[in-house]
């Protein structure tokens, strides 16, 4: 059994819906003997440089005749077909599906499983993280290599495939950032080139320091402490290269490019900042009304702006301090039309009146006659006299049009000096998080802790019955760099352990530090995820699998009266500087979501690709100029990867996206060789790369055309041939008549 270090406990108060937690102060000079935490997340440039890749702009596999952002034919037809190749790590598959959900939540871009389409994306695990730009009108790869399986990195590569280049490639780049050319690695200078408006477009948006497509300050640097790119406004140096999520400008460009007018999974959102309260209505059969109030009164602080702005910051309020016990007020949403069968209603609330007050959530459903009037009670929240805003999640399962309804009920007006508050409502067609951990007074926690100190969450259960939790290191581990917050996952013993499978494998742990931005489309939350495996062992438990039964490999935790396994996560999950930005710490509160999902069904996802000759429209872009690269050393299709890429490539035959013929082992030099260089087509035929095979487009004129695999056979058009035969026949006839007439004259 593991030895434990002495701790002293500092009590903190948290939201009523979670158990009490304590800060565990570790003895100086000791690290956690029962912790196995990964390194800080690496960026794309680091991953690809370590893999020996020297791609265009660092992570773009560039065809020779594609001008993606300016070329309308490079826009994808939605939804985009995709394949998850079986050489992908299981965690990468889950992360890709998670990234898809972000696109669906924040744009009209959608994805569908491949069903034989000519254009599709296949996600594979090669060396590094890279993509092509735009729809190539044939199957194309996105590489999610080792270390690339983070939501933000995957979103970055998908944005390339959708048609976007890097932010610092803009024509006006030098107005906003400085490039330190002497600090760039030799042969990597091309990654910092800019391109004119004929090549890329900014879609009429300003330069975006916060873009997910921007390089970080230390990209491709010679010296790890000296940046290659800095911002002319110094405050943005810590922002460029963020790998949290899409920026607001990223989404503006994406939605403009694909003409999005709405998203797929966001059904409703309301921060109550407008007088029309987002189309919500007061009930007509209740006793009182919800009141639309602002933050101007003392103690009346909204959640959206937390009282930071005068004459702004609105919320809905139901006063429970007067009237009669049992009086109710109803607040109903507009009629909503779901596309999926599950929704998550998230909102912030507080109940400052009597503990007997209640907040009920109802849905009003279609009664099969077209009227939305059939009521069903979903969940009840009891008063707690807590003056702090709390987050709540309610799962709905609506398949027809409906309304959601908030009912406030007065419990004991005589003992109430407040009421019920509502703010920042979001309804999405996504699952609700399994576990929600709220940590209050986070600034005090950061100030009163040192490296190695930790907070442990209460126990949560997933749908299978596994108990789990999160460990927060406010100032990182003892071995971490200063100024970072660490985050790790662990298992708890629970009531269901006897019947559960151990060790628990193929489950993805997802930990999310919530950006409490009221509009879900603009949230830039940090999501970290990994998948459990039998190969994840620790010497601290004699080489046993970390994910075995906690009573077998864990240590006793008196806070939960249960056993807790070794932590697994990140010692430097997010910097304090980034944490202080945006809305991560709204109202001095940190909120962490945690899920534990079974990915076993994703172990085999690859589907066969039929071998066929396809002539995709728009693949041959005649008259267009290739990108002006200016450096022959820049990697292109046939020279983008080293001869020996990755020892971890699967040895069994795989069907590659660029070669859908017979099954064969990946031959990397051939795999990326351009089959049209040199041109195998004769008689001025044009060669087109179709799934890695040379396909000739033969010249056709008014009189002649060429056929054959290499355009080697010439033919005459049938109409012309008939005309020629007729002309020749007429000529012979005329010649015969002329000869006959001449002969008759000579005889006379």
Swiss-Prot record:
Glycosylation site residues: 141, 223, 259, 319, 441, 542
UniProt-listed Enzyme Commission number(s): 3.4.24.18
Swiss-Prot/TrEMBL catalytic activity: Hydrolysis of protein and peptide substrates preferentially on carboxyl side of hydrophobic residues
Region (Disordered): 641-668
The organism's place on the tree of life at top rank: Eukaryota
Transmembrane segments: 720-739
Swiss-Prot/TrEMBL keywords: Disulfide bond, EGF-like domain, Glycoprotein, Hydrolase, Membrane, Metal-binding, Metalloprotease, Protease, Signal, Transmembrane, Transmembrane helix, Zinc, Zymogen
Cofactor note: Binds 1 zinc ion per subunit.
Activity regulation comment: Inhibited by actinonin.
GO biological process: epidermal growth factor receptor ligand maturation; proteolysis; signaling receptor ligand precursor processing
Domain (Peptidase M12A) ranges: 67-261
Span of domain MAM: 265-434
SUPFAM superfamilies linked to this entry: Concanavalin A-like lectins/glucanases (SSF49899), EGF/Laminin (SSF57196), Metalloproteases ('zincins'), catalytic domain (SSF55486), TRAF domain-like (SSF49599)
Gene Ontology molecular function: metallodipeptidase activity; metalloendopeptidase activity; metallopeptidase activity; zinc ion binding
Prosegment residue ranges: 21-66
Full protein name: Meprin A subunit alpha
Organism: Rattus norvegicus
């Amino acid at each position: 059994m593991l030895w434990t270090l002495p701790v002293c406990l500092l009590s903190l108060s948290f939201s009523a819906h979670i158990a009490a937690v304590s800060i565990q102060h570790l003895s100086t000079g000791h690290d956690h003997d029962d912790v196995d935490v990964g390194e800080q997340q690496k960026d794309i440039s680091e991953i690809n440089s370590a893999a020996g890749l020297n791609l265009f702009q660092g992570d773009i596999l560039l065809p020779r005749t594609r001008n993606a952002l300016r070329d309308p034919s490079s826009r994808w037809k939605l939804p985009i077909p995709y394949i998850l190749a079986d050489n992908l790590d299981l965690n990468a598959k889950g992360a890709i599906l998670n990234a898809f959900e972000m696109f669906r939540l924040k744009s009209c871009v959608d994805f569908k499983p491949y069903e034989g389409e000519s254009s599709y994306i296949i996600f594979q695990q090669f060396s590094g993280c890279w993509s092509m730009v735009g729809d190539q009108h044939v199957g194309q790869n996105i590489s999610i290599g080792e270390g690339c399986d983070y939501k933000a990195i995957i979103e970055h590569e998908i944005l390339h495939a959708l048609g976007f280049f890097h932010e610092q490639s803009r024509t006006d780049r030098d107005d906003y950032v400085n490039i330190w050319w002497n600090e760039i690695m030799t042969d990597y200078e091309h990654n910092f080139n800019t391109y004119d408006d004929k090549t890329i477009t900014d879609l009429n948006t300003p330069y975006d320091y916060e873009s997910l497509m921007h390089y970080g300050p230390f990209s491709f640097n010679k010296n790890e402490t000296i940046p290659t790119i800095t911002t002319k406004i110094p405050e943005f140096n810590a922002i460029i290269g963020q790998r949290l999520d899409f920026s607001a400008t990223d989404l503006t460009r994406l939605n403009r490019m694909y003409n999005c007018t709405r998203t797929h999974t966001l059904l409703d959102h309301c921060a109550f900042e407008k007088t029309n309260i987002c189309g919500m209505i007061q009930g007509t059969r209740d006793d009182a009304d919800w009141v639309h109030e602002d933050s101007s009164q003392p103690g009346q602080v909204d959640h959206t702006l937390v009282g930071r702005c005068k004459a702004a910051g609105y919320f809905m309020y139901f006063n429970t301090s007067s009237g009669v016990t049992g009086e109710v007020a109803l607040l109903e949403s507009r009629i909503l039309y779901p596309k999926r069968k599950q929704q998550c209603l998230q909102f912030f609330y507080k109940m400052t009146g009597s503990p007997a007050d209640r907040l009920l959530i109802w849905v009003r459903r279609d009664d099969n006659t077209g009227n939305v009037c059939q009521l069903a009670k979903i969940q009840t929240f009891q008063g707690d006299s807590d003056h702090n805003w709390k987050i709540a999640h309610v799962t709905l399962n609506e398949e027809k049009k409906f309304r959601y309804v908030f009912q406030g009920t007065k419990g004991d007006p005589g003992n109430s000096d407040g009421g019920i508050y509502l703010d920042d409502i979001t309804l999405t067609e996504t699952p609700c998080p399994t576990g929600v951990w709220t940590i209050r007074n986070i600034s005090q926690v950061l100030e009163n802790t040192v490296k190695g100190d930790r907070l442990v969450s209460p126990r949560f259960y997933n749908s299978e019955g596994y108990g789990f939790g999160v460990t927060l290191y406010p100032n990182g581990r003892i071995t971490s760099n200063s100024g970072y917050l660490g985050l790790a996952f662990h298992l708890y013993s629970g009531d269901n352990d006897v019947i559960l499978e151990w060790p628990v494998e193929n489950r993805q742990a997802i930990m999310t530090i919530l950006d409490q931005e009221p509009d879900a489309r603009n949230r830039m939350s940090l999501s970290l995820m990994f998948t459990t495996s039998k190969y994840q062992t620790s010497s601290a438990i004699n080489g046993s699998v970390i994910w075995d039964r906690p009573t077998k490999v864990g240590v006793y935790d008196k806070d939960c009266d249960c056993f807790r396994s070794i932590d697994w996560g990140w010692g430097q999950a997010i910097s304090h500087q980034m944490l202080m930005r945006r809305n991560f710490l709204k109202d001095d509160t940190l909120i962490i979501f945690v899920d534990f999902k079974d990915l076993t069904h994703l172990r085999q996802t690859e589907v066969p690709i039929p071998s066929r000759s396809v002539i995709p429209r728009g693949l041959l872009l005649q008259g267009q100029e290739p990108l002006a690269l200016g450096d022959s050393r820049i990697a292109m299709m046939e020279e983008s990867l080293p001869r020996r890429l990755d020892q971890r490539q699967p040895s069994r035959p795989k069907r590659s996206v660029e070669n859908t013929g017979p099954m064969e082992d990946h031959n990397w030099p051939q795999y990326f060789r351009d089959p049209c260089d040199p041109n195998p087509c004769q008689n001025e035929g044009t060669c087109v790369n179709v799934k890695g095979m040379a396909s000739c487009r033969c010249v056709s004129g008014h009189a002649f055309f060429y056929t054959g695999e290499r355009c080697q056979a010439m033919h005459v058009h049938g109409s012309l041939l008939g005309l020629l035969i007729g002309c020749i026949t007429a000529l012979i006839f005329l010649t015969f008549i002329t000869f006959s007439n001449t002969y008759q004259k000579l005889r006379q």
